[in-house]
Amino acid sequence: MRIMGLDVGSRTVGVAVSDLLGWTAQGIEIIRINEEEENFGFERLGELVKEYEVTKFVVGLPKNMNNSIGPRAEASMAYGDKIQELFQLPVDYQDERLTTVQAERFLVEQADASRAKRKKVIDKLAAVMILQNYLDAHSR
């Protein structure tokens, strides 16, 4: 049973998958999307679902700090609804407040990554953090 974690933005979707036991999350890739052109990367996502034999999605939900749902969270929920419909797999949501900030801080402090390098991996690392937080919260 593998779970796929997604960090959905307006231009990219960071993708992570769990190990078979559901203990750890690993970053896979960043899928380029374009909301304005309604290109959401579903074809590539489908390839990854098959390759990793995914049984569930976890989509990051970027709530506001006061716990309200804003436009980005609504867009993430719409993305979740669409992938649930397309792939006929369950979708859970994980609060992702500050995960991108945490990911950026990690890359600066631990990896000493340049701004250009951080930009290339930040969404994938955020997807890992979203999925790992979900796995930790739902461990048996």
UniProtKB/Swiss-Prot annotation:
Its main location: cytoplasm. It comes from the Bacteria. This is Putative pre-16S rRNA nuclease. It is found in: Cytoplasm. HAMAP family: Nuclease_YqgF. One of its GO terms (molecular function) is nuclease activity. Signal peptide: none annotated. InterPro entries: RNaseH-like_sf, YqgF, YqgF/RNaseH-like_dom, YqgF/RNaseH-like_dom_sf. Belongs to the YqgF nuclease family. Keywords: Cytoplasm, Hydrolase, Nuclease, Ribosome biogenesis. The keyword Membrane does not apply. CDD domains: YqgF. Its EC number is 3.1.-.-. It is an enzyme of class 3 (hydrolase). It comes from Enterococcus faecalis (strain ATCC 700802 / V583). Could be a nuclease involved in processing of the 5'-end of pre-16S rRNA. Transmembrane segments: none annotated. One of its GO terms (biological process) is rRNA 5'-end processing. GO terms for cellular component: cytosol.
